[in-house]
Each structure stands twice: as structure tokens, then as C-alpha cells.
Amino acid sequence: MWFTINFIKDTVIIEELEDLIKIFKEEKPLILIGGISGAGKTTVGNALLTNLELDHSIGTGWIRQILTTQLKKEYYPELFTHSFRPITDITPFENFIKGSNSIAPAIEACLKRAKAEGTSLIIEGVYLMPGIIEDSLYDYFFMLESKGSTLEYKKMVLGNSHQKVKLLI
């Protein structure tokens, strides 16, 4: 099932919102939200969490940071940098794939725990892409694309990229 999510100024519009509310009242969904840096993953995740009264949300950046306390930089250098500032001895795409594969077991563990506890969960982040996480572990996978400007990209890279927006119902 596909849902259309649009951004207009500071508003997130989910065209099939009523359908989502009905579905989420009946089940505790496990949701993944992927997309490039600055696409609005955190914004959409927070809007879904708040307005659909879901239980938990975590970003892959938080998961990556936790993993860096347990893994050595010499073996997992891709976890010790941001996706938009990859390590220098490999291509950005290779860095992205390595990062996605490195955090996949931790993401899958979070999904398994949420399912076992009967709680809803949103995981959002750059390192989420189809084919990396086992399909049977989640209910919905949103991939966002960015139509942002260079100015918005600079805000994201330099900081202050997460802003509050309202959900149009």
C-alpha cells in the first residue's frame, strides 16, 4: 500500500491520512522511513508519531552512535562519520552500502523487539534502503526524495536542519 506525503511550506500533507488512522488503530505498525539527507525523514516520522499516536521512534543516527560505543573504528569506519561526509578511501556509494549493512542487524533487533512487545515503532534514517532489512520485519517502508534547494542542503550539513512542522488533517 502506497501513501502520498507532500511538503508545502511548513506543513506535511498525507493524502490518505484517514486510511492510515483506521489501519493504525487496528494494528501496531513497524514503519521504516528512508531517504537522502534533508528529505524530511525526521519531519515525517515525528508527524506520524504524534498525529497517529504511535508508541516509539528512533533514527538510524542514534542507532549508529550507540554502535560506535561497541565497535572499533578500524573495523567499521563507516559508522564513525555521517552519510553526507563519507570516509575518504572509498566512494560515497560504497560508504553508504557499508553503513547500511553495518547497522542492519541493530535495526532488525529493534524491529524484532517491538514486534515481540506488541508496540508500534518508526525507524527513520539515511541508511534505510529496500533490500537491506528483511521484508517480514516491518509493515511499511516509506522512501522520501528531496526536492530541496542548495540552501536547505547547506542548513542540513551545517546544522539546524530539523524543524517543527504541522500535519494537515
What name fits each language-model region?
Residues 36-37:
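The conserved Walker
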Residues 40:
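Conserved glycine(s) of the Walker
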Residues 49-60:
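Post-Walker A helix-loop "phosphate-sensing" segment adjacent to the P-loop in P-loop NTPases
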Residues 33:
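Hydrophobic anchor at the beta1->P-loop junction of P-loop NTPases
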Residues 57, 69-119:
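Conserved nucleotide-sensing/catalytic segment adjacent to the nucleotide-binding pocket
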Residues 139-169:
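A glycine- and Lys/Arg-enriched "phosphate-lid" helix/loop adjacent to the NTP-binding pocket
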Residues 1-30:
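Extreme N-terminal, non-catalytic leader segments
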Residues 44, 48:
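Hydrophobic positions on the alpha1 helix immediately C-terminal to the Walker A/P-loop
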